[in-house]
């Protein structure tokens, strides 16, 4: 759903994903399969960025180490057309809506729910004809389209860690503390 609302265009070289965590990596694979796009991925964790690069990201940027605005402008030839934020924190909102290298008419989609507060220069949204959208869950039709994409075999394999359901609380703590790199699947083996 988030990808549909990001106004993605086939072969676009100016798409940015914020987060190289589980959802960001899944989005990367889906964007590659559905739109033939290898996006730029931004995160603050070098290990997660290595996973994103290995998964096919065109470029990876550590938000702590680089001037993101200049780097995005350089890599996208003038700004991102779409930014999809799987973190949803005050800092990532400021990066994206600030308007972090977004082209005129660009779309910023917020998926993550970390939260926080920020200040927005409202005229910059109007002057840049930019769109900010929030997405929480997709439709049944979109789920069907995603499953068809999976069945077609176009989505490349993405490694995941398998853990027993009894470790759910520990897994959530690991996720909260940034100890999970990639995806975890909780199983209930008998």
Segments the model singles out, each with a brief description of its role:
Residues 1-66, 70:
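Mid-domain Rossmann-like dinucleotide-binding core that forms the NAD(H)/NADP(H) cofactor-binding site
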Residues 44-45, 114, 138:
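Residues in the short beta-alpha loop(s) of Rossmann-like NAD(P)-binding domains
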Residues 65, 87-88, 112-113:
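Short glycine-/small-residue-rich Rossmann-like dinucleotide-binding loops
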Residues 78, 94-98, 140-190:
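C-terminal hydrophobic helical "lid"/dimerization subdomain
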Residues 81-84:
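N-terminal Rossmann-like NAD(P) cofactor-binding module of classical short-chain dehydrogenase/reductase
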Residues 86-94:
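Beta-loop-alpha module in the N-terminal Rossmann-like domain of NAD(P)-dependent dehydrogenases
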Residues 100-104:
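Helix-to-beta-strand junctions that scaffold the AdoMet/dcAdoMet cofactor pocket
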Residues 106-109, 119-160:
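Rossmann-fold dehydrogenase core element
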């Amino acid at each position: 759903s988030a990808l549909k609302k990001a106004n993605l265009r086939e072969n676009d070289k100016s798409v940015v994903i914020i987060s190289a965590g589980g959802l960001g990596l899944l989005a990367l694979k889906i964007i590659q399969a559905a739109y033939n796009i290898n996006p730029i991925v931004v995160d603050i964790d070098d290990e997660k960025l290595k996973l994103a690069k290995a998964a096919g990201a065109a470029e990876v940027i550590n938000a702590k180490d680089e001037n993101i605005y200049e780097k995005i402008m350089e890599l996208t030839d003038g700004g991102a057309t779409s930014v999809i934020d799987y973190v949803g924190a005050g800092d990532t909102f400021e990066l994206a809506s600030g308007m972090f290298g977004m082209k005129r008419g660009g779309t910023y989609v917020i998926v993550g729910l970390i939260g926080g507060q920020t200040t927005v220069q409202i005229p910059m949204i109007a002057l840049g004809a930019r769109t900010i959208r929030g997405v929480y869950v997709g439709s049944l039709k979109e789920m069907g389209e995603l499953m068809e994409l999976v069945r077609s075999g176009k989505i490349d394999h993405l490694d995941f860690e398998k853990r027993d359901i009894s470790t759910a609380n520990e897994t959530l703590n690991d996720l909260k503390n940034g100890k999970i790199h990639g995806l975890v699947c909780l199983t209930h083996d008998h």
